[in-house]
From Swiss-Prot:
Localization per record: Cytoplasm
Disulphide connectivity of cysteines: none
Annotated HAMAP family: SepF
Name of the protein in question: Cell division protein SepF
Gene name as annotated: sepF
Subunit note: Homodimer. Interacts with FtsZ.
Keyword flag ATP-binding: no
A Pfam family hit: SepF
Role summary: Cell division protein that is part of the divisome complex and is recruited early to the Z-ring. Probably stimulates Z-ring formation, perhaps through the cross-linking of FtsZ protofilaments. Its function overlaps with FtsA.
A GO biological process held by the record: division septum assembly
Length: 150
């Protein structure tokens, strides 16, 4: 009943026509808008196929430094994610120790690892490479590779 009274008053004041025109405009605007889906049906879903050929091959560099100044170059190679084998047999003991300290600090800072392969031969590996030395654990457990003294 109150709706009829309001309609009559709106008609008397001339507001009825404006109200109907506004409603028609809103209906036209909503009809003209196109609905775009958030997820298109053309896209691939959960593509979990990995190409075998995308694997990057690891590069190994063997270095036999002649001086301590080569430590920066060795660590730059480690920074570039290369595996480095360093042979320090030709260096004096003090210089080899300084070089080893520098390489150890750099490998720690870069998240890599430094392992002794043999006396005066070391391997530096980036954080993406895991180095295990099973030979060293065999030496410790059996007191030698070939246990001649039983």
């Amino acid at each position: 009943m109150s709706g009829k009274i309001l309609d009559k008053m709106a008609g008397l004041l001339g507001l009825e026509d404006d109200l109907e025109e506004d409603l028609e405009e809103v209906e036209e605007e909503t009809a003209e808008e196109e609905v775009t889906p958030l997820i298109s049906s053309n896209t691939k879903r959960n593509n979990k196929v990995v190409s075998i050929h995308t694997a990057v091959s690891a590069k190994v560099k063997i270095i036999k430094p002649c001086s301590y100044e080569e430590a920066v170059d060795i660590c730059d190679e480690l920074k570039n994610r290369k595996i480095i084998i360093v042979n320090t047999t030709d260096l004096e003991t003090k210089i080899a120790q300084r070089l080893l300290d520098f390489m150890g600090g750099a490998s720690y800072a870069l998240g890599g690892s430094l392992e002794e392969v043999e006396k005066s031969v070391y391997i530096l590996a980036p954080s993406t490479v895991e180095v295990t030395n099973e030979l060293k654990s065999q030496l410790i457990s059996s007191k030698g590779i070939f246990n001649w003294n039983k």
